[in-house]
Amino acid sequence: MTAITTYPLDGIQYDAKDAAAYFAPRTSGVYSAENCFTVTAAGGYTVRVSSGIGWVHPSDFEGYSIVKTEADTLTLSVADATRPRIDRIVLRYDAAARKTLLQVLEGSPDSNPTAPAISRTALVYDLV
């Protein structure tokens, strides 16, 4: 018979996979507090992303807490002179690198632009 993990209990050593399973039932997203991971124009081609808390749920048995305690500024590339584009600012969880980063997903200039695709796999998971 396979073991059943009960988490957390005092005096028991756990692995990261046990903590990941603990967070798995939470829904992916950003904590709904005011100004949590808020993106605002910061002048020129920069945007400011505020601090925040969120969760990613890349698979049925994994969930990870994301905590960013300070704001960051991201630089966008210069736009096409005649064709608009849509960029996305995402929190990208990268399982291979074992970290989450803020990233700009740059769209393609087009007369009818669409937002770039996001990833929702167990290895790379984007929160928009």
What is each model feature region?
Residues 1-59:
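N-terminal "first-domain core" detector
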Residues 4-17, 51-128:
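Beta-strand-rich solenoidal segments
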